[in-house]
Amino acid sequence: MKIVVLGGVAAGTKVAAKLKRENRDNEVVIYTKEKEISYAGCGLPYYIGGAIENRESLVVNTPHKYSSLTGVEVKTEMEAVSVDKDNKSVSFKNGESVSYDKLIIATGASPIKPAVDGVDKEGVFTLRSVDDAASIRSYAESVKKAVVVGASFIGLEVAENLKAKGLDVTVVDMASQILPGLFDPDMALYAKKEIQKTGIKIVLGAKLEAITGGEKAEGVKTNVGSINGDMVVLALGVKPNTAFVSDLGLEMEKGAIVVDDKMSTNIDSVYAVGDCALVKNMVTRKRQYSAMGSTANITGRILAKAISGED
């Protein structure tokens, strides 16, 4: 059986390795648009601040090492652009195409960039990959002030680590509290006070309207005023990387692929795991988008067991 996995970070590498382990006769191939696979996404902010000193420490396995350990073939810098469900094939940006018996979509998600002026200026960053973290870390070496837009987990972790590098850091968020939708107001207030004790400034109820400056970012304009900064990090959440299958006929909600308890989609032999898929909240029993590394690993394991006939 030939199993094609699109995406090679948490979910993709997890499901591929387990599928190969369960049946060595399976032909399992990972195709990823990235240069690297299996990197520690949760460690990216701490590489920015220097708590993780070396870039190499973020990479769990190189493609070569991963292939040697698992028997899974890895094809890097291969971006999928379309899927033909009738002929069971995937086409890539470089013009190549491959056939599959089973297709696993594990393409993850990308940072949201708001539709405001200035988001493409030099000195404006998002954080999702090792390269992103390296760029932020390098740029921060030559500036004094940073503005982080977004007060959820990633935004606050980036702020903490930029502060650790000696920068003057301001976090802005349009919500009335930090960690909106994650902490209740009382707990959020306590966390806010603890963060402010480190010298990080927090401005709430501030909706981003523009990135200010010339060619380089010089701060942000919000509905409550402007804030100066030599660099801006946008931490406004992520969106699923599913545009390339938007016309495939997959059931989706807000760009995320709907799957059942075994990670099957509504199309035969097509599955989805990780940040590009919805999962079922086992408490509420409702569909939920959970772009977390832990969720990616769990869904990858569930799918591998289902395909292997364990569950």
Describe the predicted segments one by one.
Residues 107-165:
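Glycine-rich dinucleotide-binding loop and its adjacent helix/turn
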Residues 38, 100, 113-114, 156-157, ...:
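Glycine/Thr-rich phosphate-binding loops of Rossmann-like dinucleotide-binding domains
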Residues 25-29, 69, 74-92, 98, ...:
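A Rossmann-like FAD-binding core segment of flavoenzymes
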Residues 92, 105-106, 148, 222, ...:
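Redox-cofactor binding/interface segments in oxidoreductases and associated redox assembly factors
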Residues 1-72, 153, 161-183:
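Beta1-alpha1 glycine-rich phosphate/pyrophosphate-binding loop at the start
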Residues 120-143, 215-305:
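FAD-site-proximal beta/loop scaffold in flavoenzymes
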